[in-house]
Amino acid sequence: MKKIYLCHDFSGIYDNVKLITDYIKVLISYDKNVSYISPVHLFGILYDKVDSSLYSEYCISLLKDCDMMIVFGEKSKTDECEYQINYCKKHNIPIIEYVDYCKNTLKNLQ
């Protein structure tokens, strides 16, 4: 099963968890044969409990096993997200915008 990493800002704002949950619901409605990996859902509870370098290591441990990354425009412009994006670039993990991914997926379903 394909694994796609969702690169979205958390910053300790729990409304972002709800927003990402809504994105995941849309993504799953398009393609149920993909595992959408959300570090915010997995590690959000650690956000203010561990230092940022350890938090980054947790995120990269997930990202390195993913086939692709989806970014969310301005919501992917934080230092943490940029670190993850740079990891993808360095390791040739494809990066695509959420809107473009949805358009491409819908096009392929037709």
Segment roles from a protein language model:
Residues 1-110:
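Conserved catalytic or regulatory cores that recognize and/or transform ribose-phosphate-containing ligands
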